[in-house]
Amino acid sequence: MDLTQQAKDIQNITVQETNKNNSESIECSKITMDLKFNNSRKYISITVPSKTQTMSPHIKSVDDVVVLGMNLSKFNKLTQFFICVAGVFVFYLIYGYLQELIFSVEGFKSCGWYLTLVQFAFYSIFGLIELQLIQDKRRRIPGKTYMIIAFLTVGTMGLSNTSLGYLNYPTQVIFKCCKLIPVMLGGVFIQGKRYNVADVSAAICMSLGLIWFTLADSTTAPNFNLTGVVLISLALCADAVIGNVQEKAMKLHNASNSEMVLYSYSIGFVYILLGLTCTSGLGPAVTFCAKNPVRTYGYAFLFSLTGYFGISFVLALIKIFGALIAVTVTTGRKAMTIVLSFIFFAKPFTFQYVWSGLLVVLGIFLNVYSKNMDKIRLPSLYDLINKSVEARKSRTLAQTV
């Protein structure tokens, strides 16, 4: 009996070891399958549910870029670029017109921060509505990162809106056109990027054009104030940092545009509300806007709506093509805004605006050229000299004959 019992025990141990080895091999094959699957263009993120929930894997394409419910990932890169550029130009040209129209209301120039508060409130509502239309509603970017982005967004838009109380609108826009300069500095210090001679030349041209435009504005514009220059310069610095931070966060965490807009602007709304409450600037602004609801809140709604649509396309540009390309596109849009500003709103004009603006445009061209050197071949100085010498020789030969 003892021998029989020992034989049964040995047999049971062997069966258990065999089952254990089989289960380990199955687990190894699962791990191998997961690794192979992760190497493809799609990935599986498995969320461990609570006891009352059932587990379901969420499958999402890494390259999906959705703007206002439209999936841009279905198009090629060139089509994506033209769609984003068209969206930026259409919505932001209307946005710029409405912004100048609001500040043309008598007595509104001191309400720049309150306009930013209303704008952030509308952006938060629009972002929440758009997020409900997306299947994946999880927040991917950490809260601390959003607090930093919200602070920079408040600085960018709040200081920019407030500067209009001290500056001519084209001057404010020409400052924004030179955002490439702080963006390049931000790219160097935040992402460790390197820029070539063409990019540096573009920054120099923009700087000289900006100085020339500001000097012209100081002699012709009746409401020129150095306070506005300081405010818009600080707004540019914040804007330069935010583009690089947004690009890094969205690519690292694969976040959607609607998520970025919702959390950054809702947190920014709290920042501005606390600031206006502490400085006693909320009451007078509310009283003034209550007397002119259509020309303030009505314009602000349309202003915020077009701005929200525009920022969605800008974020798509940042996510697909990077911060520098997005800045180049928005800079071209701002140049068009300056032209429309002189057409629709009466203001002093001097040809120094034209020459300084052309210098800024030259900087934009150099920036675009630096990104497409392999496609755009400009003749070198040596080639130009050779061509001129050959032309002279041919003319001399013709005269001799």
Curated annotation (Swiss-Prot):
First-listed, main subcellular location of the protein, grouped into a coarse class: Golgi
Membrane topology category: Multi-pass membrane protein
GO biological process, one term: 5'-adenylyl sulfate transmembrane transport
Glycosylation sites: 12, 71, 254
Signal sequence annotation: none
Catalytic activity, as annotated: 3'-phosphoadenylyl sulfate(in) + adenosine 3',5'-bisphosphate(out) = 3'-phosphoadenylyl sulfate(out) + adenosine 3',5'-bisphosphate(in)
Keywords linked to the UniProt accession: Antiport, Glycoprotein, Golgi apparatus, Membrane, Transmembrane, Transmembrane helix, Transport
GO cellular component, one term: endoplasmic reticulum membrane
Localization of this protein: Golgi apparatus membrane
Record-annotated membrane-spanning stretches: 78-98, 114-134, 147-167, 170-190, 196-216, 223-243, 267-287, 298-317, 324-346, 349-369
Keyword Glycoprotein listed: yes
Molecular function in Gene Ontology: 3'-phosphoadenosine 5'-phosphosulfate transmembrane transporter activity; antiporter activity
Tissues with expression: Preferentially and highly expressed in colon.
Record-linked InterPro entries: SCL35B1-4/HUT1 (IPR013657)
Keyword Glycoprotein part of the UniProt annotation: yes
Family, per entry: Belongs to the nucleotide-sugar transporter family. SLC35B subfamily.
Function: Probably functions as a 3'-phosphoadenylyl sulfate:adenosine 3',5'-bisphosphate antiporter at the Golgi membranes. Mediates the transport from the cytosol into the lumen of the Golgi of 3'-phosphoadenylyl sulfate/adenosine 3'-phospho 5'-phosphosulfate (PAPS), a universal sulfuryl donor for sulfation events that take place in that compartment.
Protein name in UniProt: Adenosine 3'-phospho 5'-phosphosulfate transporter 2
Species of provenance: Homo sapiens (Human)
Organism phylogeny: Eukaryota, Metazoa, Chordata, Craniata, Vertebrata
Gene: SLC35B3
